[in-house]
Amino acid sequence: MLSPRYWIFLFIVLAAIGFSMLKLSEEPEIITSPADPYSYRYMQLENGLKVLLVNTPDSDKASAAMSVNVGSMDDPAGRQGLAHFLEHMLFLGTEPFPEPDEYQQFIKQNGGSHNAFTSYAQTTYFFDIDNEQLPGALDRFAPFFISPAFNAEYVDREKNAVHAEYSSNLKEDGRRIFSAQKMAMNPEFGFSEFATGNLDTLSDRPDSKIRDELIHFYETHYSSDRMTLVIAGNYELDQLANWARGHFSTVPQRDVSFSRPDVPVFVPEQLPLDMNIEPVKEIRRLQFTFPLPEVESQYAYKPVSLLSNLIGHEGEGSILALLKQKGWAESLSAGRSLSTEHASTLAVTIGLTREGLVHVDDITRILMRYIELLKEQPLPEYLKEEQKLLNEMMFRYQEHGQLSDYVIRLSSNMLLFPEQDIIYGNYRAELPSNELMQRYLAGLSPENMLRTLVAPGVVTDTTDPWYDTNIRIRPSDYNNEREVEGLDTLHLPAANPFIPEDFSMSPDPATDTPEILISTTERQVWYYPEHDFQMPKSQA
């Protein structure tokens, strides 16, 4: 007969197993593509830093990226470009490696590259390097986020580098248009500010030194719980995990609360607006910008992506097909142009012909009529299904591309998606409800738009103070009651019969030599299957 002590011991063991299984089940598994040769591990360090480790078998390169949830829209008032300037300064020495070019030289001498960028809501630092040199690169990279030198003798030098970057873009139309359109935004919305920085915005002032403000900004925003790190290389995940802990566990977690103000992108009472921008080059463009509710929380349904795909459709019955028929446009694109935790915008950009310049109101009416079609009844389910199927196909057969680009993408995704969707989040497309679609469709109206005409010789009456671009902003006088011939030809896309649903591979044995399938005087078609990843792609 078994003793009571045995049963007590058995109970404790089973309870421990059950508890460990519960903990394992609570840990979300990262969703990966069936064709993905990499393996992954997510972990969170004790200081709150979120880390993704990527084992890349057979790779001769390693890479890492750190994203910080702070960007140019978080610049202090009157210090435009401070976040960007800070990005520059972190490259100029740390306590363990004080020489300003130590990191750069080590990366360069070991077959690598490095860079960083500051967007409106995040700042990302990254490098790639010969795989065997990853430990040394991490030695030099981690102190950026622990003990940067902020050496005073390099502050002026780097201010000049930022100003040179600004000056080099003064005649670049993309920057000029981007900056000019901010003048129509709500001045309380952080994105509306100048982002690059120059000698004026980054100068010392009687009441503040720029180095002191840099350090204060760093100590306010560069906190481990607002950072995401990706380390990728041809190493076992356990080894990568040891390096992550060893190098980054001392990144400080700062006791500073942070939230961005919840203010509208545009002042609602000022919409709709018409804006003219005079470019440097021969550009003719009409853009419609619609402020919408935030969409980041709806990433699993992608309502704005679905609307963008429909508006940007180029086939029969589309906006572009009618505009081309009339000779008014050459191209049309639609997509989300801004996204924060509080707001988003959808932009429709139309490349105009010379004739199209005199039909701006007619073009507007065609766009609005198509949007009315989207609103008149619930979207057909096949359109939602097609978005889901296409995204699933892209996810299933995704290619990583250059390793450094991939780790940048992953570190950015970690700021947006829960752990299980770090890879899948960009592709996940559940079927959105009709109510959700109507929520975003409601914002696509002639009363809720900034209409921007970019063309040589447009009427202007003021200038953008940062790029000296000639512009004009005024209340829109567009009348949506106008009649335009051909509106009745607009309709939603028919179901696409060419989207596959069965991805199973043919059991025919793979050939080791290319086979010619078609050979004529006009063309040759060869068949040679890809053996490793079985990707259903062709190259012409």
Model segments located where?
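Acidic/histidine-enriched segments that form metal/cofactor-coordinating
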Residues: 24-30, 68, 94-217, 266, ...
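Non-catalytic interaction/regulatory segments
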Residues: 257-264, 359-510
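Hydrophobic alpha-helical scaffolding
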Residues: 167, 171, 204, 230-234, ...
